[in-house]
């Protein structure tokens, strides 16, 4: 078990990539805080799955775009599990909106959660990491933060910002044995992009299939978990400010 006796916070942990990472971390021996925003029933279901498989997990409700809620969430996890060793900044929002229709509210919603929230989650866990003599931060970014796509300028800005924030944090925190790295998924089937996979999207899906050497449109959430475990374990002790692209080869082209 690569994460035995570690305590991990996974934001956006009740569904999609976050749910898969939380389950895999628990299977690797970690105590996992499944942080979610709104749906109590979905969060309970995710935690129950982990517990039924023999893992340890706790659902923690918080809006990770709000600093007071982030601070409360981290305190709750610390008090429940005795500390924090791993932070996965996975909570995020994605809107497909062209430049001409992007309002201040649409912009702020994505930047506040995807970028600002991630930073303040790191700040909130920092005292625990310093107490432990180290820690692991995994920022879940996107190929949209490494390249760019039309009709989602706020999302691209938020994920691109998170990529450079990862490097900035690594340069400052590496001396304290805190590893800060990013995991950049390609197209992964999650609730955030369900609207792109339904009826009427055949042309889009066909286009996606031409953009990877593997000929795939969407990957599964489970394909993200191996990289997430690696970045949370001692196997990645020499990595600081790096980006792991798990994108079915998209970035190779």
Segments (PLM) and residue ranges:
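Residue(s) in the substrate-gating loop at a strand-loop-helix junction
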Residues: 142
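Catalytic Tyr-x(3-8)-Lys segment
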Residues: 201-223
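Conserved glycine-rich cofactor-binding loop
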Residues: 7, 14-15
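C-terminal substrate-recognition "lid" of short-chain dehydrogenase/reductases
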Residues: 2, 119, 134, 217-246, ...
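Active-site helix of classical SDR
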Residues: 122, 158
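Substrate-binding pocket helix/loop in short-chain dehydrogenase/reductase
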Residues: 98-99, 106-111, 208
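Short, small/polar-rich loop/turn modules that mediate ligand/substrate recognition or access, typified
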Residues: 174, 179, 239-241
């Amino acid at each position: 078990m690569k994460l035995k006796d570690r305590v991990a916070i996974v934001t956006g942990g009740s569904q999609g990539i976050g749910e898969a990472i939380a389950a895999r971390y628990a299977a690797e021996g970690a105590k996992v805080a499944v942080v979610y925003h709104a749906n109590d029933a979905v969060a309970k279901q995710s935690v129950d799955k982990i517990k039924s498989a023999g893992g340890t997990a706790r659902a923690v409700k918080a809006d990770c775009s709000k600093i007071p809620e982030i601070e409360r969430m981290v305190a709750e996890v610390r008090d429940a599990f005795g500390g924090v060793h791993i932070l996965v900044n996975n909570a995020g929002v994605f809107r497909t909106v062209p430049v001409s229709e992007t309002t201040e509210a649409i912009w702020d919603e994505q930047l506040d959660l995807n970028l600002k929230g991630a930073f303040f989650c790191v700040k909130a866990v920092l005292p625990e990491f310093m107490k432990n003599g180290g820690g692991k931060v995994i920022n879940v970014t996107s190929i949209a933060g490494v390249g760019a796509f039309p009709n989602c300028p706020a999302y691209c800005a938020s994920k691109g910002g998170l990529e450079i924030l990862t490097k900035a944090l690594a340069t400052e925190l590496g001396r304290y044995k805190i590893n800060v790295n990013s995991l950049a998924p390609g197209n992964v089937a999650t609730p955030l992009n369900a609207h792109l996979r339904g009826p009427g999207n055949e042309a889009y899906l066909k286009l996606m299939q031409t953009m990877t050497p593997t000929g795939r449109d969407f990957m599964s959430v489970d394909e993200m978990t191996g990289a997430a475990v690696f970045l949370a374990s001692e196997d990645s002790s020499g990595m600081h400010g790096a980006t792991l692209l798990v994108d079915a080869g998209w970035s190779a082209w």
